[in-house]
From Swiss-Prot:
Coiled coil: none
Entry-linked InterPro entries: Aldolase_TIM, DUS-like_FMN-bd, DUS_fam, DusB, DusB-like, tRNA-dHydroUridine_Synthase_C, tRNA_hU_synthase_CS
PROSITE patterns: UPF0034
Protein name stated in the entry: tRNA-dihydrouridine synthase B
Active site: C100 (proton donor)
Originating species: Klebsiella pneumoniae
Protein family according to the UniProt entry: Belongs to the Dus family. DusB subfamily.
Recorded superkingdom: Bacteria
Gene3D superfamilies: Aldolase class I (3.20.20.70), Putative flavin oxidoreducatase, domain 2 (1.10.1200.80)
C-alpha cells in the first residue's frame, strides 16, 4: 500500500496510543513486522511543544521505517504550525487525530468531537495539507454516536481536502471501547472514496485480520490494543495473510528475550528515574497469559529500581525453565 509517495512494506500499521507507542514500542513493533508505526498523539497547543513529554513523543530521525507523527487540536493555524514543526523535526507523514474519544480531548473540541462539525474538519484538513509537503492522513471514528454515523461524509470531505489515507475505527465516540467494533461503516466508506482506507478496531488475531480485510475491502489494517504485550502479532498476521497458515505460539524463551530487551530500552529512553515506572504496564501486558493470578505483577509493580526489575524478570522466567 502507498501513502502519497511512500510505499509501505506491508498492510499492517501499529496504531498511535497515548502513553504506549513511544519510540521503544514503535521500534519493537516495526521489528516484529509492522509496515508502519505512528507516534503517540501530540497536542497542537504551542505551549506544550517544548515540554519534555512532547520532545519524547516526537519521532527521531534515526527511527526505522517511515516516520509518522499524529497531531491533535481544534485550531487550524495551530494544527498547521504543529505539522510544520514535526516535519522539520523529521516526520515524513503527518496524521490528524479526529478519533480520540477521551473526555479531556473532546472538551477542547479535538479528537472525535470534531466529527460533529464538518466545516471545522474541512478548515483543519485544508490548513494542514497546505502547510506541509509530506503526505497528510486522517484517523476518525464512524461518527459521534450510533444514531449519527457520518464517516462517509467525513471521508469524502477528507479526500477533497487532499488527505492521502484514512483510518476508521469501527465505533462511534459514544461507544468509547465498549461493545464490538462494526465494519459495515468502513465497508461503506471504502466504496465511496479512492484514497486508501485503513480498518481499525478489535483486530485481535490473524483470522480476524483476514476476515476484516475481506469484508471491508480495506487497503490495510491498524492494530492497537492487541499489540500491547504482544508486538509479534504483526508477524503472526502477516504470515497468515501470506500463507494461510498460523504460526505456532511464541516460545517462552523468545517472550523473555523480547520483554527484557523492551524493558532495557524503556530504562534507557526515559532514564532511571522514570523508565522503571513506564515499564510496569508493559510487563503487565506481556505476562497476562503467564501470570493470571497477578501475584508477580503486584510484586513487580512495587519495585522502584531498574536493575531490580530486570533481576525480577530473570527470576520469574527461571521458574518456567
Amino acid at each position: 500500500m502507498r501513502i502519497g509517495h511512500y510505499q509501505l512494506r506491508n498492510r499492517l500499521i501499529a496504531a498511535p496510543m497515548a502513553g504506549i507507542t513511544d519510540r521503544p514500542f514503535r521500534t519493537l513493533c516495526y521489528e516484529m513486522g509492522a509496515g508502519l508505526t505512528v507516534s503517540e498523539m501530540m497536542s497542537s497547543n504551542p505551549q506544550v511543544w517544548e515540554s519534555d513529554k512532547s520532545r519524547l513523543r516526537m519521532v527521531h530521525v534515526d527511527e526505522p521505517g517511515i516516520r509518522t507523527v499524529q497531531i491533535a487540536g481544534s485550531v487550524p493555524k495551530e494544527m498547521a504550525a504543529a505539522a510544520r514543526i514535526n516535519v522539520e523535526s523529521g516526520a515524513q507523514i503527518i496524521d490528524i487525530n479526529m478519533g480520540c474519544p477521551a473526555k479531556k480531548v473532546n472538551r477542547k473540541l479535538a479528537g472525535s468531537a470534531l466529527l460533529q462539525y464538518p466545516d471545522q474538519v474541512k478548515s483543519i484538513l485544508t490548513a494542514v495539507v497546505k502547510a506541509v509537503d509530506v503526505p497528510v492522513t486522517l484517523k476518525i471514528r464512524t461518527g459521534w454516536e450510533p444514531e449519527h454515523r457520518n464517516c462517509v461524509e467525513i471521508a469524502q470531505l477528507a479526500e477533497e481536502c487532499g488527505i492521502q489515507a484514512l483510518t476508521i475505527h469501527g465505533r462511534t465516540r459514544a461507544c468509547l471501547f465498549n461493545g464490538d467494533a462494526e465494519y459495515d461503516s468502513i465497508r461503506a466508506v471504502k466504496q465511496k472514496v479512492s484514497i486508501p482506507v485503513i480498518a481499525n478496531g478489535d483486530i485481535t488475531d490473524p483470522l480476524k485480520a483476514r476476515a476484516v480485510l475481506d469484508y471491508t475491502g480495506a487497503d490495510a489494517l491498524m492494530i492497537g490494543r492487541a499489540a500491547q504485550g504482544r508486538p509479534w502479532i504483526f508477524r503472526e498476521i502477516q504470515h497468515y495473510l501470506d500463507t494461510g497458515e498460523l504460526l505456532p505460539p511464541l516460545p517462552l524463551a523468545e517472550v523473555k528475550r523480547l520483554l527484557c530487551a523492551h524493558v532495557r530500552e524503556l530504562h534507557g529512553f526515559y532514564g532511571q528515574a522514570k523508565g522503571y515506572r513506564i515499564a510496569r504496564k508493559h510487563v503487565s501486558w506481556y505476562l497476562q497469559e503467564h501470570a493470571p493470578d497477578d501475584q508477580f505483577r503486584r510484586t513487580f509493580n512495587a519495585i522502584e529500581d531498574s536493575s531490580e526489575q530486570l533481576e525480577a524478570l530473570e527470576a520469574y522466567f527461571e521458574n518456567f525453565a
